[in-house]
Swiss-Prot record:
This is tRNA (guanosine(34)-2'-O)-methyltransferase. Methylates the 2'-O-ribose of nucleotides at position 34 of the tRNA anticodon loop of substrate tRNAs. May require WDR6 for methylation of the nucleotide at position 34 of the anticodon loop of substrate tRNAs. Plays a role in neurogenesis. Requisite for RNA-mediated gene silencing. Modifies position 34 in tRNA(Leu(CAA)), tRNA(Leu(CAG)), tRNA(Phe(GAA)), and tRNA(Trp(CCA)). It comes from Drosophila melanogaster. S-adenosyl-L-methionine binds at G53, W55, D81, D97, D122. It catalyses: cytidine(32)/guanosine(34) in tRNA + 2 S-adenosyl-L-methionine = 2'-O-methylcytidine(32)/2'-O-methylguanosine(34) in tRNA + 2 S-adenosyl-L-homocysteine + 2 H(+). Keywords: Cytoplasm, Methyltransferase, S-adenosyl-L-methionine, Transferase, tRNA processing.
Length: 320
């Protein structure tokens, strides 16, 4: 399979390289902004799980670059991720864990004591191929993004995050409705129809009365215990609003390259592999396997044992 094969099969991958985006996922945020006008007039934005930086590019392109140089300093964009990424003009990078309160404090400090007007997150776990498990882990990641948003998002702010459509979608929707007046699930055309991926678009942020920001992955706020013992009564049915982007391009379709096509390399390769820490840890572990050696000759066995005292101890009672 040639290197142009993916350019044929994935029109958004091809366009991302031609237009200078680090990943095809940039079009997902662009289409969300086109549909809901999320970024108009904003000056403070947070990109969670930002690497390799395509959504941070979109934020910079829409909020930072259109302004004259003397006015750009008022726009503050911060990208948060445990992994490093190549610099983007107008974007501050913070290598930190989004589940830590200290990360929220660092973000607010970057904004000079103010809070963000929008929080976006395109983070996703490594896929296992088991859809139920993957959707569960993705839901926990979404709740982590929502948790830190309750610390850093200003009243009336917006929140956009990846979600996997599954049986937990209604529960996550219920969680979001506690904090946002307007919530829907959005499917951009840059997201393949064959994928369970979608995005929650939540607007008009408002903390409930008496609510104290906490970790939503460990605390429930829809009071499931109130249904315990009510065997004859079922929880209310939740209908989640769904919005699909109407575009001319289809991410599942193959497009001809055209006569003037010129192959382009990806805009920015990852600085480090996501699994680099695991490689470093396992490199210190001795996982060498010593095969079993069967010796039938008694003289050979004695010579072999004489070469290494540890072998005699290991064999012990096994040698007769």
């Amino acid at each position: 399979m040639g290197r142009t094969s993916k350019d044929k099969r994935d029109i958004f991958y091809r366009l991302a390289k031609e237009q200078g985006w680090r990943a095809r996922s940039a079009f997902k945020l662009l289409q969300a902004d086109e549909t809901f006008q999320l970024l108009e007039g904003l000056t403070r934005a947070v990109d969670l799980c930002a690497a390799p930086g395509s959504w941070s590019q979109v934020l910079a392109k829409r909020l930072y670059e259109p302004l004259p140089p003397e006015e750009r300093e008022k726009v503050k964009i911060i990208a948060v991720d445990l992994q490093g990424m190549a610099p983007i003009e107008g974007v501050k990078q913070l290598r930190a864990d989004i589940s830590k309160e200290s990360t929220a404090e660092a973000i607010i400090e970057f904004f000079g004591g103010e809070k963000a007007q929008i929080v976006v997150s395109d983070g996703a776990p490594d896929s296992t191929g088991m859809h139920d498990f993957d959707s569960y882990v993705q839901g926990e990641l979404l709740l982590s993004a929502l948790s830190i948003s309750t610390f850093i998002l200003e009243e009336g702010g917006s929140f956009v995050s990846k979600i996997y459509r599954a049986d937990r979608t209604s529960r996550l929707y219920t969680q979001l409705k506690r904090f946002f007046k307007n919530v829907c699930v959005f499917k951009p055309s840059a997201s393949r129809n064959s994928s369970i991926e979608a995005f929650v678009v939540a607007r008009e942020f408002c903390l409930p009365d008496g609510y104290k920001p906490c970790n939503l992955t460990t605390e429930w706020h829809d009071q499931p215990e109130s249904w315990v013992g009510r065997k004859k009564e079922s929880p209310p049915v939740v209908q989640v609003p769904f919005v699909a982007y109407k575009g001319e391009l289809d991410s599942d379709r193959t497009y001809d390259l055209g006569e003037n096509y010129v192959y382009k390399e990806p805009v920015q390769q990852p600085l480090t592999a996501a699994y680099q820490d695991i490689l470093q840890k396992t490199s210190q572990v001795n996982i060498k396997y010593e095969g079993i050696r069967v010796i039938h000759d008694e003289e050979m066995l004695k010579k072999w044992l004489e070469n290494d005292e540890n072998k005699s101890e290991k064999l012990g009672a096994c040698v007769t």
